[in-house]
Swiss-Prot record:
List of residues binding ATP: D6, V7, G8, N9, T10, N11, I12, V13, T132
Predominant cellular place of this UniProt entry's protein: cytoplasm
Keywords, ordered alphabetically: ATP-binding, Coenzyme A biosynthesis, Cytoplasm, Kinase, Metal-binding, Nucleotide-binding, Potassium, Transferase
Lineage: Bacteria, Bacillati, Bacillota, Clostridia, Eubacteriales
Protein name: Type III pantothenate kinase
Pathway: Cofactor biosynthesis; coenzyme A biosynthesis; CoA from (R)-pantothenate: step 1/5
Location in or out of the cell: Cytoplasm
Sequence positions that bind substrate: Y100, G107, A108, D109, R110, T184
HAMAP family for this protein: Pantothen_kinase_3 (MF_01274)
Subunit record text: Homodimer.
Residues forming the catalytic site: D109
Name of the gene encoding the protein in the UniProt record: coaX
């Protein structure tokens, strides 16, 4: 079995793979003030709840966009699992050719998603990840990572609205029947959700055109992340949702580097 960790700005997602099957996964809050032992205690509880033992784990791989937390996580893995984890970054084999001006600038999460999507779909791709930031990534059939777009995430955008507009209440992000709304709560909900769906469709249409102009076939659009399902219900551009895309990418990269 292997343990995979996707460390994001808001959450850490952990998964356990037995061969190619994801048998357990959990979500913890990202907190760079926690010590290795505090994270270790949390992981002990999760393993115990699922009748798993640390001795079952033969390898660990981590993807992180939060450098300040890595010391605690690496120390936790070393202390509790007695394993040196693979850290996704320069020098790790991914099979993806990064065409960025400076490849080191590309977030590990974006590369991991590209690895998974290329492995699964084997076609030109646009990958949308609805995380703390929303990212759009273009990947060719030949596994060339062309680049993409980064937007403020849905929660960041809505939090900014609530923080800066004193009279506007915080609302649950749920779909409204339409956009001509009769109260403030529904008006905010429709603005965020339908506005974001429109943003997705416009960026995807522009990205598709640019990829086709480069000689690619029409890309397949796959979405992942916490708000993927909500936005996909209104977006006309998303072909498929893959909720475990990042975890799958970590598994594939582990296999390439073990």
């Amino acid at each position: 079995m292997i343990l995979v960790l996707d460390v994001g700005n808001t959450n850490i997602v952990l998964g356990i793979y037995k061969n190619k099957e994801l048998i357990a996964n959990w979500r913890l809050a990202t907190d760079n003030k926690r010590t290795a032992d505090e994270y270790g205690i949390q992981v002990i509880e999760l393993f115990s709840h699922n009748n798993l033992s640390f001795s079952d784990i033969e390898g660990v791989i981590i993807s992180s966009v939060v450098p300040n937390i890595m010391y605690s996580l690496e120390h936790m893995i070393s202390k509790y699992f007695n394993i040196k984890p693979i850290i996704v970054g320069p020098g790790v084999k991914t099979g993806i050719n990064i065409k960025y001006d400076n490849p080191k600038e590309v977030g590990a999460d974006r590369i991991v998603n590209a690895v998974a999507a290329h492995e699964i779909y084997k076609k030109p791709l646009i990958i949308i990840d609805f995380g703390t930031a929303t990212t759009f990534c273009a990947v060719t059939k030949e596994a060339n990572y062309l680049g993409g777009t980064i937007c403020p995430g849905i929660k960041i955008s809505s939090d900014a609205l609530f923080d800066k507009a004193a009279k506007l209440p915080r609302v649950e992000l749920v779909k409204t029947p339409g956009v001509i709304c009769k109260n403030t709560v529904a008006s905010i909900q429709s603005g965020i959700i339908y506005g974001y769906a429109g943003q997705v469709d416009y960026i995807v249409s522009k990205m598709k055109k640019e990829m086709i102009d480069l000689g690619e076939e029409e890309p397949f659009v796959v979405a992942t992340g916490g708000f993927a399902k909500l936005i996909s219900e209104e977006s006309k551009s998303i072909d498929e949702i893959n909720a475990i895309l990042t975890l799958e990418g970590l598994r594939v990269i582990y296999e390439k580097n073990k």
